[in-house]
Swiss-Prot record:
Keyword set includes Cell inner membrane: yes
Keywords assigned by UniProt, alphabetized: ATP synthesis, ATP-binding, Cell inner membrane, Cell membrane, CF(1), Hydrogen ion transport, Ion transport, Membrane, Nucleotide-binding, Translocase, Transport
Function: Produces ATP from ADP in the presence of a proton gradient across the membrane. The alpha chain is a regulatory subunit.
Protein name: ATP synthase subunit alpha
Family of the protein in this entry: Belongs to the ATPase alpha/beta chains family.
Catalyzed reaction equations: ATP + H2O + 4 H(+)(in) = ADP + phosphate + 5 H(+)(out)
Amino acid sequence: MQIKAEEISKIIEEQIQSYEQRVEMSETGTVLSVGDGIARVYGVRNAMAMELLEFPGGLMGMVLNLEEDNVGVALLGEDTGIKEGDPVKRTGKIFSVPVGDEVMGRVLNPLGQPIDGLGPLEAKEFRPVELKAPGIIARKSVHQPMPTGIKAIDAMTPIGRGQRELIIGDRQTGKTAVCIDAILAQRDTGIRCFYVAIGQKKATVALVADTLRKHGAMEYTTIISATASEPAPLQFISAYSGCTMAEFYRDKGDHALIIYDDLSKQAVAYRQMSLLLRRPPGREAYPGDVFYLHSRLLERAAKVNDSLGAGSLTALPIIETQAGDVSAYIPTNVISITDGQVYLEPNLFNAGIRPAINVGLSVSRVGGAAQIKAMKQVAGTMRLDLAQYRELAAFAQFGSDLDKATKQKLDRGARLVELLKQPQYQPMPVEQQVASMYAATRGLMDDVPVLAIRKFEAEMLDFLKNSKADILNDIKTKKALDADIEDRLKAAVAEFKKGFQA
């Protein structure tokens, strides 16, 4: 094959015309040292705090420390392939994660990459993980209920949309179970749920995902997982990644719920990073800004005012205590940031009272305004009744003779405790809760044996659903107990009692 001379010259001319000189400038540096997920980099003089740097092999790192002669970088992945002398490139970008409906139903890592084997994530929008919380003017007070389906919480420590309610307790007291029930209860509310697993075992996260899938809740839930085997920087950043994904719905006028399981492990990961970055340690060796670590995260949960779309983000952070010590550093920090706490106690758990909620120590500081009127009417005195019952039960142990009124309070209290027990993964609709609380607090269960209370409640609710569905529907729509509903409910319970056999 011969090419003519004029053809060669034509090809060369075309090549010259299409040649474009492109100079790409990037500021580079060199790795001084690396270990435990932290790298020291020399030479990137203009790097900014929280900026991403690119290491060999595409590994990203986030700038945390800016010092005179080098920068401290948290590596967002395994550091095994990085060695001293490796080149590092500035990206000029802030760490961002995918947001939008595409993340729903997926299990992601803190970088927003899918780890569930269901194919790539086709996200159209990305947002930075560190965003400013809404200001004072942008907010509105909490006034809409966010039912959890758990009787003890919805009656005595109600949660509203936009609230931060801490779930606190020792290990193995059912903290995660409470939060999973809260997710299951959102099936028909349109609230999007996000579950952030920080420092959990992989088996635990797999079990949570499996449970949500089994109950049909995975379609409106996203799991962000930074397990115990992940490097500390990923455990630290995972909560912010999840928050950014959830905020997307708050900002477009929808409602979202986010669960951080748990912030104790996030604080431990942050402590590890801070000590490796040679930041000065404070109380319990945590760095001085560990309060800010949690406050800037939890302040992003808010009820937004009507002019900004009236969306909300509700947060349920979990804190694990050691031997019930709520006065330790991290628990007191998070208690002071949140709008109340649900305290779970091992003694109650072991006594078979599950969920093991200590009513005396649990409180909701803003949820009362969000509680529906019907629930206020039936559960208003419940906390007081239970507190009196606990006090009298301790006194009655001495075996002294009790008068009729005291005995009646003890009997009613024992029935209330029994009524508040609830099986796992069975959240109860609010109208059914109101009906059973009404029967208990108005003395309609006083003649039912304590051991038969749960059977009585289940059969009574079945009776109401099948034969008197109009009563439950009226409670659901009117959200209050007027004289007519009350009379019909009382008559229905009396009718059911005639045929009930303990």
